[in-house]
Amino acid sequence: MCVVRIRSGYKKHKQTNTQGDEDTMKGYPWSGTRRRFLQGSAATMAALYGLRPVQALADIPNEYDGSKFQLAAPEPNPKHGGVLRMGILSRLPHFDFHQSGTIGSLGSQACMYDNLIRHDPRDSGKTIIPDLAHSWEIAKDNKTFTFFLRKGVVFSDGADLTADDVKATFDRIAKPPEGVSIPRSILFKSVSEIVTPDKYTVQFKLSAPRSPSFIMAAIASGWNGIVRKKTLEDNNYNLRKVADIPGTGPFKSVRRVENEVWVMEKKKDYWNKNLPYLDGIEFYNLIPFSPELGSAVLSNRVDYARIVDPVTARKAKSTPGMSTTAFNQSVIQGIWINDKKKPFDDPRVRRAFHLAMDRHVMVDVTKDVAPMRVGGFIYPFSEFATPTDQLFKRVGYQEDPTAAIKEAKALMTAAGYGNGIKGLDFMVRDIASFKLWSQAFQAMLQQNIDVQCNLRTVVESVWFDDATSGHFDLCIGAIVSTLLDPSDYFNAWYRPSGPQDYSFWNNAKFNDLVDQIDTELDPAKRKALIRQAEEIMEQDPPVLPVCWEQINDVWWTYLKGYNPYDYFGLYDVAREDIFWLDKA
């Protein structure tokens, strides 16, 4: 038997996993006294975490001539040469990064591709700048977006880039064929067609006006690397098994050892003649928050480490010659409940599970593994969120969980499950934070509403396949959005048409509200609609929000060309083309 402290004292709880083992929880972070979680407004919370509030995109001009624009490092006289050693998750679920939703894909693949337009890595992605398109025009009615392509750009297989490749790439992203699921497709639901007036011009035509900042940011997403039309045609528009997808980016693949290292080299015929500065990159597969990742960067076996644990970040901060930063991740850490299976087709049961979770304890569980913050269904650091001081007065988010547990028990009884539920399949993604949270929530369910779960830990490829197919009762993991705007993730995460609605949740009133949110231009009216949608989710949750993530990155200061201090997420600026090494 093991002892777990869940607020009101110590209780006995038998933990069960798929092997039937009994593991002690003694020594896990939640077995001790929980530190009080910081309270305050969203801006205050950001300051207390050492984070800057997330800033909006810079204004986007309706007409931009970037025919002479060439991206370069922000520092004067950057040096060419050297190989960057990067520690990052590089455990791909498959090779089709358009279909992916994990840094395990894009973190190592992004450097091989270019975008149509991109987020500027020099200002943490706040400005939209040219990429394969050097210039653009946005019609006054905000319904036609025209892009003018560079000439002389070649793919890594020697083929010339044309507008047909851009069209084929975005046609697949916007309207994936059968058997293909792309998490960002929902961003382009207002795009009625993509046309190519000539070999080097591409137009996105919208069925209704949308804000240029929304559409341009959607197009510029780091996930939207351009691939060849022929590559798509040759592989029936599904690139999951294509290990070397030709790209136009600054690097190309040289060697890959599964789950160990992926070696890239500089592409000598890259269209930007001054880039890249590096001769190559070695991506070492190291798990986020792991002691192995921390050890690798602290011992200088890698130059840069993505997503380190807080202990490593603190050590790096006090080590001469090292730098670290923290920024908000574009991800929700959640537990999905399979609405296609009983008893989860009952909103009362879903809300009971929602209320059975003590989110302040969940944050404390991983305080030395992964820095997190309490939040609901909306990015807590965004302008659209319920202010934190108000959120913490809401049942399910209060410091004292007594009221939440009382309501959860009553809901289970009303739904006919007053005696609990046994034998639920709880699928866990194989990362330290998810394993810790799953054990904590397993204990909370058992103690608070007499629900017993069997934990099943799986790697990314299995997790995403089983989540998509519904092969689970509960599953814990993380999903990503592209934008802070709810019109992105409300559609992608919480609607049946969304590619990341892993709970298979469908609420007609919510769907109607999101349609209104998408088209409402008055900020005050739009925010009121968002509040109504939030209230629906509180009563009928599409996912159980666990918490929201903060990223700590660590690097040696001889690495230059890098400005991570105001990132929102880590997917839009993952190309390393302006990185350089200031070594003798």
Placement of each model-derived feature along the sequence:
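Structural transition elements
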Residues: 372-414, 431-436
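Extracytoplasmic/peripheral linker and loop segments enriched in polar/acidic and small residues
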Residues: 72, 77, 363, 376, ...
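Gly/Pro-rich hinge or "lid" segments in bacterial periplasmic/extracellular proteins
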Residues: 113-123, 219-276, 280, 291, ...
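N-terminal lobe/hinge region of extracytoplasmic solute-binding protein
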Residues: 69-71, 87-140, 171, 244-248
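Surface-exposed binding/hinge segments that line
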Residues: 148, 184-232
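N-terminal secretory signal peptides
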Residues: 1-36, 43-47, 57
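Long beta-strand-rich cores associated with HINT superfamily self-processing modules
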Residues: 555-584
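Ligand-site clamp/hinge motif
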Residues: 150, 269-315, 450, 454
